[in-house]
Structures are given as C-alpha cells and as structure tokens.
C-alpha cells in the first residue's frame, strides 16, 4: 500500500498522485490541514522535508522524484 502525504496546490504532489493512479497502484492520499497538521508532517518526516512524501509498504521513499525513481528501479511502475 502506498501512502502519499500531500498539500493542496502542490504540483509535485499532483504529479506523484497522477503516476500512482495511472499505474493503478493501491494508495491513500493524506492532505495537509485535512488529515494531518504541518507539525505532524515535520515530526514524521523531519523539519527539512518537502511535499509530497511517499511511504511504500511502511518504507519511507521520500519526495516525488525519489519515489518515482525507486518505483522505476524496482519495476513497480513507470516502465517506459
């Protein structure tokens, strides 16, 4: 299961969500100020973390580019 921590209006969040949905991967999207606070986000991922952040089966992959790269390398998605 993929967990995406996003915020409204974030283009990288939208890109990552679009990729995951296009690939048909099971996921849940958590939205800042609806599902969690900024303090919760920094406590979970660290003060310097940016949006989005992705967790795959309990493993923190990181932001948009890191997550897509990992999923490509592991042949989970995005095979072009």
Regions found by a protein language model. Give the residues of each.
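Structural micro-motif
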Residues: 45-55, 64-65
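Non-catalytic, surface beta->alpha helical segment in thiol-disulfide oxidoreductase systems
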Residues: 56-80
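Short alpha-helical
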Residues: 11, 36, 62
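Alpha-helical elements of the RecA-like P-loop NTPase motor core of helicases
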Residues: 14, 18, 39, 69
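Residues at alpha-helix termini
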Residues: 23, 44-45, 74
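Thioredoxin-like thiol-disulfide oxidoreductase module
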Residues: 31-48
